[in-house]
Amino acid sequence: ISMVSNNFYDISLSKVDDDLTITFESSEEVQSPSVTIGGVGADSVSGDGTNWTAVRTMTGSDIEGIVLFTIDYLDLAGNAGVQNVSTTDQTGVIFDRTIPEMAMISIASDNNNYDHLAKVEDELAMTFTSTESIQTPVVMLGGL
């Protein structure tokens, strides 16, 4: 049993509109399993009887944190299997729907006379904080 996200930056992280995919294999043919991802039924469950894939798109109403799941199934005779609630390969996904915010603290130049003015060849330094860990930001000043 494996669970990953289609997040561009990290398959163990998810945000709103990312798809979470659970893939699993049964030891014998089973009827179409019932799968929940984040407490909500999977958008799709498909398979060939022993190899299965369940997918769900995360929404703004999902709970942040480690995404929990359940897999319930019956064999072809109708015997219920033991509910699965954990991966077998240590994969997992953390859902984050909080948009990071940036707060500007200061912009200063190395101008010898005034640190709030800059001329050609002066260097500018911008210091800011974010409300959570972020990737290295791309900073543009004056459209450059």
Language model: regions and residue ranges:
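A short beta-strand segment in extracellular, disulfide-stabilized domains
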Residues: 19-24, 123-128
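Flexible, low-complexity linkers/stalks enriched in Thr/Pro that connect modular domains
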Residues: 1-2, 86-108
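Surface-exposed, short loops/turns at beta-strand junctions within beta-sandwich domains
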Residues: 58-66
